[in-house]
Regions:
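Buried hydrophobic packing segments
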Residues: 104-112, 275-282, 417-427
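Conserved N-terminal alpha-helix of the aminotransferase class I/II PLP-enzyme fold
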Residues: 3-20, 49-103, 114, 125
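Conserved C-terminal alpha-helix-loop-beta "cap" of PLP-dependent enzymes
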Residues: 2-32, 36, 116, 166, ...
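Structural motif
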Residues: 44-47, 124-125, 183-187, 344-345, ...
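A conserved active-site cap/scaffold subdomain adjacent to cofactor or substrate pockets
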Residues: 249-293
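Polybasic, low-complexity association/targeting segments
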Residues: 22-67, 190-195
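Conserved PLP-enzyme active-site core in the AAT-like
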Residues: 96-268
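Short, glycine-/Ser/Thr-/acidic-enriched flexible segments
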Residues: 48-49, 242-244, 258-260, 347, ...
Length: 433
C-alpha cells in the first residue's frame, strides 16, 4: 500500500455515524476519542470503551507493516481469524467479519432468507441493540419480540419468558415457517434469554425448521461456552468492542458446519485495525489462570454490591442467574456477573427520570467540574427498565481484569470503582428534584 490515512482516521473509518467524531468534541457517539485516555476510569464496557494504549500501539504497528508491505490485508485477516477460532478449528466453523453486532444479525437472517417464509423470535431491542429489528427487517421476515422485564422494570421469570418463546415458535412452525430464534447471552443488563435448555429443546424438536443465533455480542462467555454453542449447531455473534474493550464497531458472525460453505465478509481496513486492537486484550485475558479471573470478579462484585447497598441514592437491580445447563456443566468464570445495573434515586425516594439519568451519565465523562473527584468516568449507557426509568450499568471488562493481576492492581480497581460511584452520587445530588 503506497499511502494510508493516519491511524486515528482509520480507527473510525467505516461510514457509520455512531463512530464518526463530533467536530467540536473529537468524540464519537459513545463519548470515546480515537486515541487512548489512560486517566479515564472506564467501567462502560457494556456499551463502548476507549482504545487501550497497547491496542493503539498494535494497530499503529499493523498500519506500518501494511505501508511497507511486510504484511498484507489477507494475511492479517487470516491471523485474526485463526486466533478467534483457537481450539474450535476442528469444528469447520466459518467466520464472517462485519462492522457491528447489528450487521451480524442481518447476515444471519440473510443466510436463512431463502427458507421462505421466515419468522424471527428475538429479545426486545431495549436489552440487545437498538438497530437490530430495522436491520433484519430488510429481508422481510415476520418478527416477534419478547420482553425480558415486566412493566415495573423487574425481570420476568425464566419460565414466563421460555413459555412465550415456545408459544411463538410453535405457532410459526405450524404455519410452515422456518424459525430463527435469537437468544441473548448476555443482554445489556447481563441476562440470558430464553434459557439455553429452552433453545436446545426447540432445536431438537424442530430440527430442519429451526435455527438459533446466539447474540453473544457482549462476548462475556468463556471459550468452553463458545465451543459448546458451536457444537450445538448454533450461530454465534460476538464483538471485540464490549468485554474486550476494543474500539467500537468490530464484530464476527460464527457459522457452524451446515451453513454456507463460503461467506462474504467485510474487508474494511478500519475494521481490521479495530480487531487488531481488540485482540491485544483478548490475548492478555486468555493468558490468565481461570482461578485468578474468578477471584478478581468475586472481589469486585463484593465491593460494588456493598457500595450500592449502603447508599439510598442507588438501587441495584436483581442480578440474573447465568445458568448454561444443559449446554455444559463445568464451572467457569462466565457464571459470574460482570454487569451490575442500578437505578439512581433522589433523596426523597423518587427515581431519577430517564432524562436525568442520561444527564448524570453524560456529566460523569467530563473532567472540568469542581467535584470531589474530577476524573473522567465512564459507565454503560442508561437502559430503559420500566416506565420513565433507566438504569446505569457498572461493567467489568477483560482489560480491567488483566490490569488487576498486576502489583496493587486489585487495590486500584476497587479504588477506581468507588471513585466512580462517589462522583455518581455527587451528581445525583445536583440534579434538580
Amino acid at each position: 500500500m503506497r499511502d494510508l490515512p493516519g491511524i486515528e482516521a482509520l480507527l473510525v473509518a467505516g461510514d457509520d455515524a455512531r463512530i464518526a467524531l463530533d467536530h467540536l468534541t473529537g468524540l464519537n457517539k459513545y463519548g470515546c476519542p480515537p486515541r487512548p485516555d489512560p486517566e479515564q476510569l472506564a467501567f462502560g464496557s457494556s456499551t463502548a470503551s476507549v482504545i487501550s494504549q497497547s491496542g493503539y500501539a498494535a494497530a499503529a504497528r499493523l498500519r506500518e507493516r501494511l505501508l511497507d508491505r511486510t504484511d498484507t490485508l489477507e494475511l492479517s485477516w487470516q491471523r485474526i481469524r485463526q486466533e478467534l477460532l483457537s481450539d474450535n478449528s476442528d469444528l469447520n466453523v466459518q467466520l464472517a467479519f462485519v462492522p457491528s453486532g447489528t450487521d451480524a444479525h442481518a447476515l444471519a437472517v440473510q443466510h436463512l432468507s431463502g427458507l421462505a417464509p421466515l419468522s424471527v423470535v428475538m429479545v426486545e431491542e431495549s436489552e440487545t441493540g437498538s438497530g437490530v429489528r430495522a436491520a433484519i427487517s430488510c429481508h422481510h421476515p415476520q418478527i416477534n419480540a419478547v420482553s425480558l422485564r415486566a412493566a415495573d422494570g423487574m425481570p420476568r421469570t425464566s419460565e414466563k419468558i421460555d413459555a412465550e418463546v415456545v408459544a411463538l415458535v410453535e405457532a410459526a412452525v405450524a404455519l410452515g415457517h422456518h424459525v430463527l430464534l435469537v437468544m441473548v447471552d448476555q443482554s445489556k443488563t447481563g441476562m440470558i434469554a430464553p434459557s439455553i435448555s429452552c433453545a436446545i429443546a426447540l432445536s431438537e424438536r424442530h430440527s430442519e425448521k429451526f435455527s438459533v443465533l446466539v447474540d453473544a455480542c457482549q462476548f462475556r462467555i468463556a471459550p468452553a461456552t463458545l465451543r459448546a454453542y458451536l457444537r450445538q449447531g448454533f450461530m454465534v455473534a460476538i464483538t471485540g468492542s464490549k468485554f474486550l474493550t476494543g474500539p467500537a464497531f468490530s464484530a464476527v458472525l460464527m457459522l457452524p458446519e451446515g451453513y454456507a460453505q463460503r461467506v462474504e465478509d467485510c474487508k474494511d481496513l478500519g475494521l481490521l485495525l479495530r480487531w487488531e486492537a481488540a485482540m491485544v486484550e483478548h490475548r492478555r485475558f486468555c493468558a490468565l489462570e481461570q482461578s485468578q479471573v474468578i477471584r478478581i470478579m468475586e472481589n469486585f462484585a463484593q465491593v460494588v454490591r456493598q457500595r450500592l447497598a449502603e447508599d439510598q441514592r442507588f438501587e441495584l437491580l436483581p442480578e440474573p442467574l447465568l445458568d448454561r445447563r444443559p449446554l455444559l456443566t463445568e464451572e467457569s468464570w462466565d457464571r459470574l456477573p460482570s454487569i451490575f445495573s442500578f437505578v439512581l434515586y433522589h433523596r426523597k425516594d423518587r427515581p431519577l427520570t430517564r432524562e436525568e439519568t442520561q444527564r448524570v451519565y453524560s456529566l460523569l465523562q467530563l473532567s472540568d467540574m469542581d467535584v470531589i473527584d474530577g476524573r473522567r468516568c465512564q459507565l454503560g449507557q442508561p437502559v430503559a427498565i420500566g416506565k420513565g426509568v433507566s438504569a446505569l450499568r457498572f461493567a467489568l471488562s477483560a482489560r480491567l481484569i488483566s490490569d488487576a493481576i498486576l502489583p496493587k492492581g486489585m487495590d486500584k480497581l476497587k479504588d477506581d470503582a468507588l471513585a466512580v460511584l462517589e462522583k455518581t452520587a455527587w451528581l445525583v445530588d445536583r440534579i434538580r428534584d
